[in-house]
């Protein structure tokens, strides 16, 4: 969400207040909004339907923004963003974001530092997690059968480099030319809660790609993440998952899903349920937003084609 001079705007929450569409949600910064698309069965004109849905949702938000005299832009890293847009005044008002920020600051025990070496070098420091707000992505999900998950997840890891190479679009941050896709380095460092001692112990960063192939089942990934990363936020959980299964119901696994949402693997395993049935998905998180809706659908088609065409 941009002001007339194409700098980040504070108007995101005001736009969100005027919307009754559940597809539109907030993000950590007031100038970022998220559009969630409906799932489609991969057959016939699925990509065209996804494109049409994206266009329809975009037009709705664009009209709401225009009433506030604001503009919308799809961009992995906005070239006009700078440190003045990373103060707490620009953080979204929802309590969750304040809690996450406070917990991460307390865990780290010092400011969040970034050092990125590219064509130029950037060294900067911030006392909040709002470096994360510089990143926006086009997150793609593919539902996978449980029996195929290990093979498909490993394949998603294998193809990540060529897919990212075809989709890079964020070379600039704070006026510096850095990586061809600066989001990768920035996101990893912006949420790195490790102290120097943690680094010496080779503790895993919370944003990571992975360091081994998956061998047995998706539960190995979830167990590994639970063992490696402490809880950041919790919510009341009244459901007894084992009892739900015994009664023939589909458990929500709410605690697992909340924790999984704070582990930022570039290919993230996801558990969900819909229509009374559980499902597993692989979420691609490394492709940037934009620069146009056509580009996003093209990136989706490329990734989807590779995922479905695995040898």
Predicted regions and their residues:
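Phosphate/nucleotide-binding catalytic core
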Residues: 1-311
């Amino acid at each position: 969400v941009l002001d007339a001079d194409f700098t980040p705007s504070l108007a995101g929450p005001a736009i969100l207040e005027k919307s009754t569409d559940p597809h539109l949600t907030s993000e950590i910064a007031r100038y970022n909004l998220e559009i969630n698309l409906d799932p489609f069965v991969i057959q016939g004109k699925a990509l065209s339907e996804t494109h049409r849905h994206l266009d329809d949702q975009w037009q709705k938000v664009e009209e709401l923004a225009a009433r506030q005299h604001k503009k919308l832009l799809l961009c992995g890293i906005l070239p006009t963003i700078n440190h003045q847009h990373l103060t707490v005044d620009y953080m979204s008002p929802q309590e969750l974001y304040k809690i996450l920020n406070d917990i991460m600051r307390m865990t780290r025990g010092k400011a969040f530092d970034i050092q990125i070496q590219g064509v130029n070098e950037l060294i900067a420091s911030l006392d909040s997690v709002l470096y994360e707000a510089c990143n926006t992505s086009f997150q793609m999900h593919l539902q996978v059968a449980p029996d195929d998950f290990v093979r498909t997840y490993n394949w998603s890891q294998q193809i990540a480099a060529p897919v990212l190479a075809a989709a890079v679009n964020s070379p600039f941050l704070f006026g510096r030319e850095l990586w061809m896709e600066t989001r990768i380095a920035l996101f990893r460092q912006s949420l790195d809660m490790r102290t120097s001692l943690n680094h010496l112990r080779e503790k895993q960063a919370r944003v990571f790609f992975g360091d081994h192939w998956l061998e047995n089942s998706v539960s190995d990934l979830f167990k590994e993440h639970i063992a490696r990363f402490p809880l950041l936020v919790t919510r009341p959980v009244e459901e007894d998952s084992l009892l739900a299964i015994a009664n023939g119901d589909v458990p929500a696994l709410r605690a697992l899903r909340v924790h999984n949402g704070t582990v930022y693997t570039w290919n993230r395993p996801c558990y969900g349920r819909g229509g009374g049935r559980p499902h597993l998905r692989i979420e691609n998180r490394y492709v940037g937003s934009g620069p146009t809706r056509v580009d996003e659908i093209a990136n989706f088609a490329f990734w989807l084609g590779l995922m479905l065409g695995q040898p």
